[in-house]
Design a protein with these regions (language model features):
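Short linear elements at protein peripheries
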Residues: 52, 213-224
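A structural signal for short, hydrophobic/glycine-enriched beta-strand patches
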Residues: 29-195
Length: 224
């Protein structure tokens, strides 16, 4: 009798795992297919638009190590600017220097300000950089570009996997978006972490779409 119960539980567990894996796989594939033909590795192939949207990143990881993804996103955004593919860059991220209780966060970062400094160092005119402090999620960055800044088209700058997800979110708002891919980190640990994080983020994307999650913004538009 006990053996029969164990077998039944194992069967149900196996079915649950299979269903979960199928859902995760479907979310991943759907995001990739949707962005097909709209992500670019060659800056010369990127269609010119007025605005670029640089998705939030910090120069330092939560472990206190240098973040290669930050360097590569800044490089990609500067390439777009210097190639005259975008005129303005929205540096969208969050200020993570303090937690919800106001305590200083070890290795915390003011992402928009750090991105601004790095972009200026890369030769981007400071008057062509817009700081967005409400980009604490990709959804918020994309939604604000459309709903607050009033954009109807944008070049998104991040790594390939991130760009594809952001494009799917842009489609929801009728915002025409393409992605310019920053070079991914070559470190094996980063690849594993980013893949796991992206897998969960893509599932969360479709949960947000299903339930109609809508961010609310406090700041007024400040763009050219």
């Amino acid at each position: 009798m006990l053996s029969h119960k164990i077998k039944r539980i194992s069967l149900y567990a196996g079915i649950a795992v299979a269903v979960a894996a199928s859902i995760i796989g479907a979310c991943w594939v759907a995001v990739d297919v949707n962005a097909s033909g709209r992500v670019y590795d060659d800056v010369s192939q990127v269609p010119a638009m007025r605005y670029g949207l640089l998705l939030g990143t910090s120069p330092v990881t939560p472990r206190g190590t240098h973040n290669i993804n930050f360097d590569n996103r800044i490089k990609a955004a500067a390439e777009l600017y210097h190639a005259c593919k975008v005129r303005y860059i929205i540096a969208s991220g969050g200020d993570y220097r303090r937690d919800a209780e106001g305590n200083a966060v070890l290795y915390g970062c003011d992402e928009p300000r750090q991105m601004q400094r790095a972009l200026i160092a890369a030769g981007v005119d400071s008057t062509h950089i817009i700081l967005d402090y409400e980009g604490t999620r990709t959804l918020y960055s994309v939604a604000k570009a459309c709903k607050v800044y009033g954009l109807d088209s944008v070049v998104i700058v991040s790594q390939d996997y991130h760009n594809r997800r952001a494009i799917r979110q842009a489609d929801r708002y009728g915002l025409y978006a393409v992605g310019y891919n920053a070079t991914p980190s070559p470190e094996a640990g980063n690849v594993v972490r980013n893949t796991l994080r992206e897998t969960l983020a893509r599932v969360k994307l479709y949960i947000d779409l299903w339930f109609g999650a809508e961010p609310q913004f406090a700041s007024a538009p400040d763009h050219k």
